[in-house]
Design a protein with these regions (language model features):
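Conserved class I S-adenosyl-L-methionine
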Residues: 1-40
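Class I SAM-dependent methyltransferase SAM/SAH-binding core
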Residues: 46-48, 52-99
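A conserved beta-strand element that flanks and buttresses the S-adenosyl-L-methionine
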Residues: 110
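Short catalytic micro-motifs in class I SAM-dependent methyltransferases
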Residues: 113-116, 144
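A short glycine-rich, Lys/Arg-flanked "PGG" loop and its adjoining helix->strand segment in the class I
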Residues: 124-136
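Conserved beta-strand signature within the Rossmann-like core of class I S-adenosyl-L-methionine
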Residues: 137-145
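C-terminal alpha-helical "lid/dimerization" subdomain adjacent to the S-adenosyl-L-methionine
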Residues: 145-199
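Core SAM-dependent methyltransferase catalytic element
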Residues: 204-222
Length: 222
């Protein structure tokens, strides 16, 4: 099913994100190209913090997935995704990644712009649950805001990000408000800290997949 109102709502939502996040669509293109390079095609896929279903938009037209699970703690977002993608091979779970019930069930787990909203303890629990949800040799791909290594770097990166948003037509006040959320509404960690966290949670391989502005993609292999 592809309800017109759901499609409109998701398109409007995605356009607002594009005004905020540089190269937003590249997140999902990189997910697809990375999974395509894996030796075995995925049959089971969990997307945590699925939002309106942007990851599924790319995945379901690229792979013959037998089971795709949408998970989000927002019933409103989950309903939009359900309106767009309800089919026999899809499931919709309302819940928090820090409380995932899945164990050894998925070939792929994705989390796009999710885990940086948590405290250090909450982030570790979220990443550990993603690890536990994977089958052996399963793939975890996440995209997160990251923290620069210095105050000078942080100021430069934030100003650059603000300039990007201004160029997309956002108001100066909206841009300042968004940049002001750093370490108040989301809590980024450095690239090194993220990779170490993944190793601490059990991943035998942890790599940087993609990087631009203050966003990075990470790859973990169980």
């Amino acid at each position: 099913m592809n309800d017109n109102s759901s499609a409109f709502n998701s398109a409007e939502y995605d356009e607002k994100i594009r005004q905020t996040l540089p190269y937003y669509d590249d997140f999902f293109a990189n997910i697809v190209s990375t999974v395509r390079a894996c030796p075995n095609p995925p049959k089971s896929w969990l997307d945590v913090g699925c939002g309106t279903g942007k990851t599924a938009e790319y995945v379901l037209k690229s792979f013959d997935v037998e089971r795709f699970v949408f998970c989000d703690n927002s019933e409103e977002m989950l309903n939009i995704a359900r309106g767009r993608f309800s089919a026999e091979n899809t499931e919709f779970v309302i819940g928090d990644v820090r409380e995932l019930p899945f164990r050894n069930e998925f070939d792929i787990v994705t989390a796009v712009q999710v885990n940086h909203y948590f405290s250090a303890e909450g982030r570790k629990l979220a990443v550990k649950n993603c690890f536990e949800a994977l089958k052996p040799n399963g793939i975890f791909i996440s995209f997160e805001n990251f923290a620069p290594y210095s105050e000078i770097g942080k100021r430069l990166y934030l100003d650059r990000w603000k300039n990007f948003q201004l160029e997309q037509g956002r108001s100066p006040d909206a841009c300042e408000e968004h940049i002001g959320r750093y370490n108040k509404e989301y809590f980024p960690i450095t690239l090194s800290e993220q990779l170490q966290l993944m190793r601490d949670c059990g991943f035998k391989s942890a790599e940087i997949l993609w990087l631009s502005y203050m966003q990075a993609g990470f790859l973990g292999v169980k």
